[in-house]
Structure formats: structure tokens, C-alpha cells
Amino acid sequence: MFYSRYFIPTIKETPSDAEVVSHQLMLRAGMIRKLAAGIYNYLPLGLRSIRKFEAIVREEMNRAGAIEMLMPSVQPAELWEESGRWSFYGKELLRFRDRKDGEFCMGPTHEEVITDMVRREIKSYRQMPVNFYQIQTKFRDEIRPRFGLMRGREFIMKDAYSFDVDSAAADGSYELMFQAYMRIFERCGLNFRAVEADTGTIGGSSSHEFMVLADSGEDAIVSCDSCRYAANVEKAESRPAAGASTEEQLELTKTATPDMKSIADVAAFLGLATDRTIKALVYSSTTGEHVMAILRGDHELNEIKLKNCLGWDEIQMATDEEILAYTGSPVGFLGPMGLKQGVVVVADLALRGMANAVIGANEKDMHYINANLGRDFTSDRFVDLRNVEAGDPCPRCEGGKLEMWRGIEVGHVFKLGTKYSQALGATYLDADGKEQVIFMGCYGIGIGRTVAAAIEQNHDDNGIIFPLPLAPFHCSVVALNTKDKGVMAAAEEMYFRLEQQGIEVLFDDRDERPGVKFKDNDLIGIPLRIVVGSKGLSEGKVEVKIRASGEMLLLSPDEAVETIVRMVRDAVTSAQ
């Protein structure tokens, strides 16, 4: 491709509305342009990287036995009402009516559509296992779209759906997709983790997220420094206390704590560490239920864990008025002792290892010291409620410690079980002629989001540093003086030789200053660059620059071509 005939509208200045590096660089590199909030045009350079990633995804999906198809973006409301998600999904679901007053939505995902197709077409156990996938445009009406392709409203996604005769077979399909995802992100040259995750609005029994590690990542994840355990912080398990404390239980005492409403204030006032305190938090459901959660004062409540253990769809912090009505206690002095009848208390597992703790006395300006579980207060149930922290012991191995990372979610796989097949009546006849419900899995990858995440992980002050498998071009050939016929002839010859060997080359034949060409080539992130100038040619040399390392090589034109071809082929071979 000749640069002068291509369309790469680079920008020198960083757009003021671009908050994260990938958004800034994709705009500056001429890869995308905003059409409306969260909706983007993919310009030629950006589309090349998108197509590169799609090709890797297709190869691995096909290798894993998945079958490509394409479903409509527009979906009828009836299917979503059958699954129960029409009212549950919320305002992210873009709904509209056609001229006949029929209700529809723009698909944010396709569980209902694919299950509807399967219930019509698959009737026998002999037709399974089967796995369908598509690469499709989705739409989710995000309340605050931002970060470019990282959190847009319209986006490209690969989604796959597996159908099996039973749970064991579904586990096998899940493992096939898990391994396919591992290969996909390994082939892209990305530093990533596969982590245990919450199933969220999709539902199902278990799931894994695939996280590209980046300091700018919105998600907090943990991994063990000794074993392979890794999880999103929403899902990460804390290791239970070894057992009840052996510390001697002291006499319970009520003490004044005037205007000390926070854990930090109470601990400081009493001259104790915050890990000697217990905090109480009250939450409510959308149906008016309430619960008190208690945990160590230095720990943070994980609301996802609380919601899941209660089986509630949503939870929210109770208002001061709700807390007073439910517990009879003023805010700031809540505790698990002396509560009104009917108050449900859920305790974190770590409390089993505490003794002589400080708790709220359910009375203004008063706390108890030396409160002990079992003797002074009880809990209706004990569950893992807290967020894990860096340095916590690993829940899966002995001696391992948890490390904290920031990550960008680029893929998610779910064991759905019978959630959708049961709701939509997707059944089959087994070998005995009996009707059974189909077991499902679903598997998503954000296409544009992965390209953006690759940029978040791979960039410097000069621009993008694309991993070679995702780069729009493998190599650029830069002619320094386009008016020098010898330079142009040598550069053109190298360009055509590389193309003939399957190398994707951008020939920078523009009549621009060398500095402009170098800046643009660095900005758009092409991994390899050959610089052809009159001075070098007079010595029989050209310059090869490796973008990621900054290494420069002075080689003959023949050596340069051989080096580029070898590096590209090595990268492609290792990725496969």
C-alpha cells in the first residue's frame, strides 16, 4: 500500500475529550472517528487491525469445532419476555416499535435468538454437541459511554453458544472454548490472565474473564504468586480464618464514643487498630427486604458476594431512615447485639477468628468493647463477604500469596446450564426417547475492545507499539527523499519484494520531511520499519528499526528484506 494513496488522517494534538491512552492514540493515528456518543467510524487503518483480530478469532473458533453463522441485530421483544430479561435488563436495552407497533430491541447479546433457533431445529441427542458463533455488531445504551472503543454503545463482538445433552458434556464444550480463548490471546502477543468471575446479568453457574493487564484497566484482579489461581476481585475468595481465637475472652463493657461514627474514628479514640473492630452495614433489595452484614473493620464489603449469597437481583445501601426503622439503631453506632426481632445478620468468615472486638451498641454515642461471637452476639449465617487484598493467603494452595493487578476485560465465557433453554423450551429427545432440557454455554470476545486493550498495554510517548499479529501493516518502507530517483527505485524494489513474500507493507512515498514521516510511522504503531536514504545507499545500506525495542540495524537491502521476512514469519509461526 502506498501511503500517498491511502487514508491515514493523523492528528498532532491529543483530543481533549479522549481520557484513556487507547482512545487518544486511535484518534491521533487516524484509526477511528466519533459519529455520536459511544458510536465510531472505523477508518481504513483501524479496520485493518480489527480484521486481523477477527481472522485470529475465526481460525481458533473453527479449530475448536464452532460453526459460523450470522443473526439479526434487531430482536423481537417476545423472545426477551420469554426469557424474563425484557424487564430485568434495564435501560441499556435499546427498545423501539415498528410501524405495526411491534416491540423490538437492538441486540446487546444473542442468547434468546440462538436458543429460539435451536429449539426449532435441534430435536435429537444425535444433533449435539454443536457450537455456533458469529462476529456481529451489538448495541448497549450505556449511560456514560467513554474511553473510545473500550466502552462504546455500538461495538463488534464475537459471541458463541454451545449446546449439549447434559452438564458433563457442557463442561467439555466449555473447556474447548476456554482453551481456544487462551490460544487467541496468546497469538495476539498480549499479557493477559484468565480469571474466575461473577456471571452478572448473563447468569449461569460459573464463568471466566480474560483480562489484558494494563495500569489503566477498570477491573481489579488477583492472582496467586505460587499456583494458577486468578479471579476478578468481585469473585476472588478470601481464605477463612483457621479457627476460633484462643485469646482469653474479656468482660463486655459499654463505653462512650461521642460523635465517633466511623470505624477509623472509633478505633483511634479507643487506641485500637481497626482490625479489632466490627462494622455493620444494612442493605435493602428492590422488593423491600433488608439485611445486616457484619465484617472486620479493616475489611471492605464485596457487594457482589453479598447479593449472590442472598439470591437478590440487586442490592443497595439502606437509607438512614430505613436503618432506623429496621434495626432501631441510629446510623454510626450499628452493631449485631440487641437488635429488633426479625433482623437478619450475615457475617463474614473472618469474624470466626476474632476475640474481644469493638462493636456498635445500637445506641447513639455508644460502643461495646470486648464483644465476642457466640457469647455476646450471633449471626444467621457465615459467608465470604469481603474483598481480598494484596498479600492475603491464596484460597487454593498452601504458602501462596495474592497479588493485585489492573485488567481490561476482553473476553468472557459462561456455563449457562439450562437458564435459557428451560425458559424458552429448548429440549431434545435422548437415546430412550425421553424429553430433556439442553445444556448451554456462551462465549464472548470484544473485537474492538481487544484492539484498544492491546494499545493500552503497548504504547510509548511516541504512539502505538502494536504486537505484530494485530498491526495494520507488518512493515513500513520509508523513502527519505522522494525526489531522488535512486532512493525511490531502491525503496520501491524493496516494497515489491516484501509484498511478493506475503509481507504487508506500507510504502511511505509522501513528499514530506523525514521527521514527519518518522513521527507518523511511530504514531500508527507499525512494528518494523526500513528507512531508505541516499547516504545509506551510497554505502550499500538501509536502516531497519524495530518499534518495540527501538533497536536499529544497518543492513544491505537484501539483508533487510530477509530480516523482515524472517521476523514476520517467526512471529506468525510462534503464534500458531
Swiss-Prot record:
Pfam families: HGTP_anticodon, tRNA-synt_2b, tRNA_edit. It catalyses: tRNA(Pro) + L-proline + ATP = L-prolyl-tRNA(Pro) + AMP + diphosphate. It is an enzyme of class 6 (ligase). GO terms for cellular component: cytosol. It comes from the Bacteria. The keyword Transcription does not apply. Transmembrane segments: none annotated. InterPro entries: aa-tRNA-synt_IIb (IPR002314), aa-tRNA-synth_II (IPR006195), aa-tRNA-synth_II/BPL/LPL (IPR045864), Anticodon-bd (IPR004154), Anticodon-bd_dom_sf (IPR036621), Pro-tRNA-ligase_IIa (IPR002316), Pro-tRNA-synth_IIa_bac-type (IPR004500), Pro-tRNA-Synthase_IIa_type1 (IPR023717). GO terms for molecular function: aminoacyl-tRNA deacylase activity; ATP binding; proline-tRNA ligase activity. Keywords: Aminoacyl-tRNA synthetase, ATP-binding, Cytoplasm, Ligase, Nucleotide-binding, Protein biosynthesis. GO terms for biological process: prolyl-tRNA aminoacylation. Belongs to the class-II aminoacyl-tRNA synthetase family. ProS type 1 subfamily. This is Proline--tRNA ligase. It comes from Pelobacter propionicus (strain DSM 2379 / NBRC 103807 / OttBd1).
